[in-house]
């Protein structure tokens, strides 16, 4: 870069002191730029560390914003609750009472100061009057003391007026303080009445919700009991039909097996009666018939084993179902005993006898009807009690709201 600057140079003139002259000098400045530097590649540790720091900062900022939002939301809802209950009005009234008390105490202090000043002035005036009484009227100090007494009387009058104004201000501030206290007490009483009324309303609503919930729970239990009874009614019938079908098929297979064995015996006896001449020519046919019969016999035996295993499984299921039905019958018996405590103890053997006589379905149906009637009766009683409670509480609520 080339630039031009004006400098001062020394020039020696022959026999003359050196003088400063201005010369124009050209300065040349060369700027060397470095070659393009290649960016340094970051190591994976540095990249991971930077990412960790960024994520930490982001998490901290996010947590701070979430805390601020949660605190603002909680404060908003708390302010709404205080406004709804009336705590804001009570707090404002208490603040007014505090301010009125401070003003009253200031006025009281002013009254005290004015009274002290007035008493001090009266004391001084008394001293001056005593001196006037002791000095003769022809004395030179008498005029000075009379003038001082006059000034002190004027000052006493001013202090007395100040004291009276301070007392009036004190009475006014005391009346304002009393009004603020009464207002605070009224606001507190109103808040207490409102809280009591809302508590009563909440109790009534809670009772109604409890009755509705108990009714719903009883209905759901009744439906579950109905489903259980229906399953208990359908289970033995379907299982007996399946056992009957399997038994019939087993008997048919046994009869077919006996017929097959008889045919096989007849064929064996017929084969032994033939001569040795026809034995060589008919041996392939006889072997083939024997193989067919053996295969049929093996198939029949395997089918019989399968049928027997199925029958055993059905018998186990029947035993389990009988246990379940006996348990259900015991539960029904307990419910019946709870509904009718005057029944005899001999009815404890009712489920077993009903199961043996095949009349359990009728007993279950009867028990279902009784339980349904009892649940309906309890629901009706609960509804009547709720209605009566609401009718009894409604005039009380009306009187409370009217009074408040």
UniProtKB/Swiss-Prot annotation:
Pore-forming subunit of the mitochondrial ATP-gated potassium channel (mitoK(ATP)). Together with ATP-binding subunit ABCB8/MITOSUR of the mitoK(ATP) channel, mediates ATP-dependent K(+) currents across the mitochondrial inner membrane. An increase in ATP intracellular levels closes the channel, inhibiting K(+) transport, whereas a decrease in ATP levels enhances K(+) uptake in the mitochondrial matrix. May contribute to the homeostatic control of cellular metabolism under stress conditions by regulating the mitochondrial matrix volume. InterPro entries: CCDC51. GO terms for cellular component: mitochondrial ATP-gated potassium channel complex; mitochondrial inner membrane. The modification Phosphoserine is found at residue 65. One of its GO terms (biological process) is mitochondrial potassium ion transmembrane transport. It comes from the Eukaryota. Keywords: Coiled coil, Ion channel, Ion transport, Membrane, Mitochondrion, Mitochondrion inner membrane, Phosphoprotein, Potassium, Potassium channel, Potassium transport, Transit peptide, Transmembrane, Transmembrane helix, Transport. The keyword Transmembrane applies. It is found in: Mitochondrion inner membrane. Residues 1-30 form a transit peptide. Its main location: mitochondrion. This is Mitochondrial potassium channel. It catalyses: K(+)(in) = K(+)(out). Residues 31-196, 402-404 are mitochondrial matrix. The chain crosses the membrane at residues 197-217, 381-401. The mitochondrial potassium channel (mitoK(ATP)) forms a heteromultimer. GO terms for molecular function: mitochondrial ATP-gated potassium channel activity. The keyword Transport applies. Channel activity inhibited by ATP via ABCB8/MITOSUR subunit. The gene is CCDC51. Residues 218-380 are mitochondrial intermembrane. Residues 111-138 form a coiled coil. It is a multi-pass membrane protein.
């Amino acid at each position: 870069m080339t630039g031009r600057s004006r400098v001062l140079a020394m020039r020696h003139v022959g026999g003359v002191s050196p003088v400063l002259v201005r010369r124009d000098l050209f300065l040349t400045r060369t700027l060397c730029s470095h070659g393009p530097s290649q960016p340094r590649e970051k190591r994976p540790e540095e990249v991971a560390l930077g990412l960790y720091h960024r994520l930490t900062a982001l998490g901290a900022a996010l947590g701070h914003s979430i805390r601020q939002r949660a605190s603002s939301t909680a404060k908003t809802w708390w302010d709404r609750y205080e406004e709804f209950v009336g705590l804001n009005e009570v707090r404002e009234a208490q603040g007014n009472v505090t301010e009125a008390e401070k003003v009253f105490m200031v006025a009281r202090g002013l009254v005290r100061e004015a009274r002290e000043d007035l008493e001090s002035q009266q004391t001084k005036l008394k001293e001056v009057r005593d001196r006037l009484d002791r000095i003769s009227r022809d004395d030179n100090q008498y005029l000075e003391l009379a003038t001082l007494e006059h000034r002190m009387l004027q000052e006493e009058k001013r202090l007395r007026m100040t004291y009276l104004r301070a007392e009036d201000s004190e009475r006014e501030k005391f009346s304002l303080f009393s009004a603020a206290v009464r207002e605070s007490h009224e606001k507190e009483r109103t808040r207490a009445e409102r809280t009591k009324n809302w508590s009563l309303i909440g109790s009534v609503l809670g009772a109604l919700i409890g009755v509705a919930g108990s009714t719903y729970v009883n209905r759901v239990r009744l439906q579950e009991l109905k489903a259980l009874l229906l399953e208990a009614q359908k289970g033995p019938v379907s299982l007996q039909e399946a056992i009957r079908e399997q038994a019939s098929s087993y008997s048919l297979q046994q009869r077919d097996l006996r017929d097959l064995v008889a045919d096989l015996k007849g064929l064996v006896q017929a084969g032994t009666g033939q001569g040795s001449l026809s034995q060589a020519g008919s041996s392939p046919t006889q072997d083939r018939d024997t193989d067919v019969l053996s295969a049929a016999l093996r198939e029949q035996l395997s089918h019989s084993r399968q049928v027997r295993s199925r029958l055993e499984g059905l018998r186990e299921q029947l035993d389990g179902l009988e246990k379940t039905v006996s348990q259900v019958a015991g539960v029904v018996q307990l419910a019946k005993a709870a509904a009718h405590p005057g029944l005899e103890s001999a009815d404890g053997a009712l489920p077993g006898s009903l199961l043996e006589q095949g009349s359990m379905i009728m007993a279950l149906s009867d028990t279902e009807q009784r339980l349904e009637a009892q649940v309906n009766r309890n629901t009706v009683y609960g509804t009547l009690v709720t209605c009566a409670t609401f009718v009894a509480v409604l005039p009380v609520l009306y009187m409370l709201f009217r009074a408040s």
